[in-house]
Design a protein with these regions (language model features):
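Ferredoxin-type iron-sulfur electron-transfer modules in oxidoreductases and energy-metabolism complexes
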Residues: 2-38, 42-131
Length: 131
């Protein structure tokens, strides 16, 4: 719940951002985003991890939202906020991959790589940018 409150949703008013239906979204990218959206937040990945990490869950949420036009608006803020909560509430990712076979939704380990990419991207862009 804390991770979702920290950034697991699209919270900003889009303002002048184009409507999602107006933005051409490639079929493969949309399918990829929907694959990550399959995460049900059950916690099986956390239970399977020897460190109690929630990196697969957080990665699935960040990947899903950053791949869709609606979620790109606040992707930097979301990555920073979610990783702050992730670090405070869960153990570090062991990178052993025990979480993947435990996931009933079939979220791939690529979600953890995408989590790391979003965090790095947000850090390189600085605390003042959200894109």
């Amino acid at each position: 719940d804390e991770l979702i409150r920290a950034g697991g949703t699209v919270d900003v008013a889009a303002g002048t951002a184009p409507d999602a239906d107006d933005v051409a979204q490639g079929h493969l990218q949309a399918e990829r985003a929907l694959d990550f959206a399959a995460c049900i937040g059950c916690g099986a990945c956390v239970a399977a991890c020897p460190n109690g990490a929630a990196a697969l869950f957080a990665g699935a949420k960040l990947a899903h939202l950053s791949l869709m036009p609606q979620g790109r608006i606040e992707r930097g803020r979301r990555a920073r906020a979610m990783t702050r909560e992730l670090d405070a509430l869960f153990g570090p990712c062991s990178e052993y991959g025990e979480c993947v076979p435990a996931c009933p939704a079939g979220i791939p380990i690529e979600a953890i790589a995408l989590l790391n990419r979003e965090v790095l991207r947000a850090g390189l862009r600085g605390a003042t940018r959200d894109d």
